[in-house]
A protein has these predicted regions:
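All-alpha RGS (Regulator of G-protein Signaling) helical domain and cognate RGS-like helical scaffolds
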Residues: 4, 8-11, 17-205
Length: 205
């Protein structure tokens, strides 16, 4: 592959370890800086009340990310170390699904059902752009729910996953020629309602 995808394997692999320090990344998802607005956002109530609803909202997003990477792997658009790195990304998203599912159950809730998804996978550059959008959105989504989470344990887990999503996004942003320098001292959160609207085109049922 030519251009920005040549170093995909090296860049993605470097950002994949949970032992790495957290990285911030820019987002272009229409986010807001208002913590009050985030705390007032009740869009996750459709998934359940309180922390369970927030966890199920996050679980739904992780379902989408896991399905996306699975489809990319099947597409064979990437080869060699590039494909291996994408497989690693997908594996980490699948681990998030397991962790969130287990947490919902431990809190006495019912995990959200897995939606059927469909993603446009036309060529490698387009897939990288879509992956960057998905990962930036995921990172912003977790941060957006931080003010609403009541349990310290759930908050710690959510921020840990947010860190991984941010590193995924930073790697993809680099390959797309976007700056790796954050556009401010604080990462930008995203309201659940906006995030759900953004991913709706990928959900077919």
């Amino acid at each position: 592959m030519a251009g920005g995808t040549v170093a995909l394997g090296a860049v993605l692999a470097a950002c994949g370890s949970d032992d790495d320090s957290s990285s911030s990344t820019t987002t272009d998802t229409g986010t807001t800086d208002s913590g009050d607005a985030m705390a007032a956002d009740t869009s996750t109530d459709m998934f359940g009340k309180g922390d369970i609803g927030i966890l199920n909202y996050a679980l739904t997003l992780e379902y989408l990310e896991t399905a996306f990477y699975a489809d990319v792997i099947k597409s064979k658009l990437f080869k060699g170390s590039d494909q291996e790195a994408i497989i690693k990304f997908g594996s980490q998203e699948a681990d998030h699904v397991v962790a969130l599912t287990d947490t919902v159950k431990k809190l006495g809730g019912k995990p959200a059902p897995k939606p059927k998804t469909e993603f446009p996978l036309m060529n490698a550059p387009q897939v990288l752009k879509l992956a960057s959008t998905v990962e930036n959105l995921g990172a912003a989504a977790y941060l957006g729910q931080a003010p609403r989470i009541k349990s310290p344990e759930v908050l710690a887990a959510a921020l840990s996953i947010h860190s991984v999503e941010a590193r995924h996004a930073a790697a993809l942003n680099t390959l797309l020629g976007k700056t790796i320098v954050p556009d401010g001292p604080f990462a930008k959160p995203a309201e659940a309602g906006m995030v759900l609207n953004a991913v709706q085109p990928f959900i077919i049922s």
